Amino acid sequence: MAKKVSAYIKLQVKAGSANPSPPVGPALGQHGVNIMEFCKAFNARTEKLEKGAPTPVVITVYSDRSFTFETKTPPASFLLKKAAGITSGSSKPNKDKVGKVTHAQLLEIAKTKEPDMTGSDLEAKARCIAGSARSMGLVVEG
């Protein structure tokens, strides 16, 4: 028989650096999950990713206080900022442009995000990423 799910917890944790401090500790503690067990498992699973990259994670907590978790790819905004070499997007994206990204960079980001995106092909996913880039104040070239 399948275990009964008691909660889903969605967090964004830096890859390779999960620790019991907020936001991880309080979110897991209120559901009775072993926090250190999660931190060790998460850090082991994300050790191949770029250290410090924000990694969305969905934790499924079961009624017996056991858990499973699924990691996602880093947010498009993080990947776009890294590709453009900027620290933050524009506060006025329609007026102030803060950087440039090429079509090749968009395709590379779309390949990275492919498991978490919907879309018929890589080109459609790249167009979606291009929309995110424009809303951050980046100029899309090509």
Swiss-Prot record:
One Pfam short name: Ribosomal_L11
One of the GO BP terms on file: translation
Keyword hit for RNA-binding: yes
Post-translational modifications reported in the UniProt record: One or more lysine residues are methylated.
Record-linked SUPFAM superfamilies: Ribosomal L11/L12e N-terminal domain, Ribosomal protein L11, C-terminal domain
One GO MF term attached to the UniProt entry: structural constituent of ribosome
SMART domains: RL11
GO cellular component, one term: cytosolic large ribosomal subunit
Subunit architecture: Part of the ribosomal stalk of the 50S ribosomal subunit. Interacts with L10 and the large rRNA to form the base of the stalk. L10 forms an elongated spine to which L12 dimers bind in a sequential fashion forming a multimeric L10(L12)X complex.
Family stated for the protein in its record: Belongs to the universal ribosomal protein uL11 family.
Protein name: Large ribosomal subunit protein uL11
Species name: Tolumonas auensis (strain DSM 9187 / NBRC 110442 / TA 4)
